[in-house]
């Protein structure tokens, strides 16, 4: 018996997010500039931050350009064929591995049309393969492995190519979204909050919910899911490893702080890959359209902003010692335990409420059929997993200490300076503390991101559950931090 397609769902009222079109414009065109600023201002030429920025009375733009390594041919020097071809090759390799390596197929959540999309998951295999190749090259050639030296020498140009890529893919999916027709056999849908009618805002927030493309020899690729966990997350680990290699080329050693940050961030990423199917129930997949917001975040923001600490340490090494390492690992363990335990509890309850590990939990039965947990981890706060996620971010930044350094010319003979292999000397001097604006940015940003996500989720749940959600909020009063927020 044929299944009747659902009628078009009633349009849910959604206001603008991110301050509407002005916010969309600012994020889309100023965040890329901010990434450039971070990576120019904190550099391996003059210091972190560049010395001119600490001397406002004698500030000179020409001097600043020299200190940060601004290309001699200006903006044109921000791009290169080498950097662009590297980005193309990297993404083509990701697509090939996506197709040829073993994978599992999982159905996504039910769409408003009543259908379900199928997803092909093998990110763990493809990423492990890539890392194994890089590890083999490093074992054979050490820190001089061409991948590591190429990334250091073409760092800004690779960044530029990825920024351009994020703009191109955002524009492609936006234009293509106008071919979505109700009742189509491919289960294509528009995102509820992504077709406001404002071109800039819809391009930014994402007009189509799950844009897919058929690629010759590769097959169908879900663009949003593919970019969520593959090139950017993998790039984050690769970027960290390249800065560890740079530290070794600079000094002949790799500090415990660099190893710690690289290892714990890799653990975080591997956890995402290991639990790849769990992405199907996240807001990114079920609710948000795919536009510039997610494209830029996946392709550029994650690998280039999240690796700022290891880049800093490649120039100014910091040794934590046994006690420092123990403290950082303790924070990581606490955050990871909260994050994973809470998510596992929720997933077990959704899958099998009679599971002995969760059958004792109390809940509110909503009119929509869903159950809202009011005890256990989710009785402590509405997003206790966000607290664990945020705690995990602290050891990413804390190892940089009172960050900031100045790079002096060879032969300065400054007491206590770190001396690079090329003779240049690195001291903190008057830059001490100012570098924290860059190396601790992640903690601040991630906290704001999680608060914003919680607010968005709260609004979505209130629209979905109505008075049941209001009752739930009376029982579980805290949003993220139990008793505080």
Curated annotation (Swiss-Prot):
It is a multi-pass membrane protein. Pfam families: ERG4_ERG24. The keyword Glycoprotein applies. Pathway: Steroid metabolism; ergosterol biosynthesis. InterPro entries: ERG24_DHCR-like, Sterol_reductase_CS. Disruption phenotype: In contrast to the disruption of ERG24B, does not affect sensitivity to amine fungicides. Keywords: Endoplasmic reticulum, Glycoprotein, Lipid biosynthesis, Lipid metabolism, Membrane, Oxidoreductase, Steroid biosynthesis, Steroid metabolism, Sterol biosynthesis, Sterol metabolism, Transmembrane, Transmembrane helix. It catalyses: 4,4-dimethyl-5alpha-cholesta-8,24-dien-3beta-ol + NADP(+) = 4,4-dimethyl-5alpha-cholesta-8,14,24-trien-3beta-ol + NADPH + H(+). The chain crosses the membrane at residues 18-38, 77-97, 131-151, 155-175, 259-279, 285-305, 319-339, 431-451. Glycans are attached at residue 240. Belongs to the ERG4/ERG24 family. In Fusarium, the biosynthesis pathway of the sterol precursors leading to the prevalent sterol ergosterol differs from yeast. The ringsystem of lanosterol in S.cerevisiae is firstly demethylised in three enzymatic steps leading to the intermediate zymosterol and secondly a methyl group is added to zymosterol by the sterol 24-C-methyltransferase to form fecosterol. In Fusarium, lanosterol is firstly transmethylated by the sterol 24-C-methyltransferase leading to the intermediate eburicol and secondly demethylated in three steps to form fecosterol. This is Delta(14)-sterol reductase ERG24A.
